[in-house]
Amino acid sequence: MSSSGSKVFPTFRVVIVYEDFRTAAQAKRAYDFLAANLTHEWQLTSQMWKFELLRIPELRDMAAEDAAMANLIIVSCHGDQELPADVTDWVEMWQGDKGEPVALVALFDRPPEQAQHARTTQAYLERVAKRGRMEFFTWPEGLPELEILVPDRASVTAAEPLCQAA
């Protein structure tokens, strides 16, 4: 409880990086689904970054800071080309700075077998997740049940003062 008597919920942070409007809309639908189904014991926040913005070093740094604090990171793309170097540079910036990550999601707008570079992107992000001891999921092949993505309430009790300060 806060000093005003209202209950303070821990923050569940989502960072979305996306290729274009279509992939942003797809990621937003996934976020909205999460928001609609996430237990009401969490305050859900999101940051969205377009691939193009990661070309600018200062913005890439800001996006990396956001990702380092995130519980869930979604990379939304078509998969018809390799991830741009600016995006992989961004991934390498935050992946070593993760505290207690929950999940990394590769979100494609078509099945990976229908996109020339989706499997390469998927494999790269899966390696990143493994190095960072994160859960890894890909879509449209199937996301897990929602409760897998949400940290155990007891595991964040100690972090609640940090969540409140953020």
Model-derived features: where do they sit?
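A short, flexible N-terminal coil/short beta segment enriched in small residues
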Residues: 1-37
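Ser/Thr/Gly-rich flexible loops in soluble cytosolic domains mediating phosphotransfer, phosphorylation
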Residues: 89-131
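Short acidic active-site motifs
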Residues: 59-62
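Glycine-rich, aromatic-bearing surface loops/beta-hairpins
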Residues: 128-166
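A short beta-strand-loop structural module common to alpha/beta enzyme folds
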Residues: 37-54
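Short acidic, S/G/P-rich loop/turn micro-motifs used as interaction or catalytic elements
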Residues: 21-23, 53-56, 75-84, 110-115
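Conserved beta-strand segments of the P-loop GTPase G domain that flank and frequently precede/overlap
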Residues: 16-18, 49-50, 73-78, 104-109
